[in-house]
Amino acid sequence: MSKPVKIGPWGGNGGSERDVQPKPIRMVSMTVSSGAIVDAIAFTYVGTDNVQHSSGIKWGGTGGTEDTINLDATNYVTEISGTVGKFGTDDIVTSLKIITSKGVTRTYGSGTGIPFRVPVLDGGKIAGFFGRAGAFLDAIGFYITP
């Protein structure tokens, strides 16, 4: 089994560091809370121990509307893009766009700020997240598996 690779993070330095143990090899579901910005994210995943785990409480605040994407071995995240920018005086994740292998596309937040994009090639998958969070999702990075 290949070890997941960390890519990123994108965003600001506010909030507290967020990460998971064991490291993820496949995402099972993800929940994003958003309005004008990305308020919070949470996910469940299969770890390097082949057991299902949760990221725990949402990383971020309590605002926004919640949306969940359920994934499986044939429907996985192949690309995430988004923007990071100012919200008040804080640098945070202002938008996310999620694309799955089955063509499911979801967009969260306003889309204002500096863009980033993480496409995964050759059958790779976005298996999980790490980053920083406080009252909002301050920064986000990704675990990629082949």
Swiss-Prot record:
Gene Ontology CC terms: apoplast
Entry GO MF terms: D-mannose binding
Principal subcellular localization: secreted
Occurrences of domain Jacalin-type lectin (ranges): 4-146
InterPro entries for this protein: Jacalin-like_lectin_dom, Jacalin-like_lectin_dom_plant, Jacalin-like_lectin_dom_sf
Keywords of the record: Apoplast, Lectin, Mannose-binding, Secreted
One Pfam family from the record: Jacalin
Region of interest called Disordered, as start-end residue ranges on this chain: 1-21
PROSITE patterns (UniProt xref): JACALIN_LECTIN
Subcellular location field: Secreted, Extracellular space, Apoplast
Family statement drawn from the similarity comment of this UniProt entry: Belongs to the jacalin lectin family.
Functional note: Mannose-specific lectin. Has a weak agglutinating activity against rabbit erythrocytes.
PANTHER family linked to this entry: OS05G0143600 PROTEIN
Full protein name: Horcolin
Organism: Hordeum vulgare
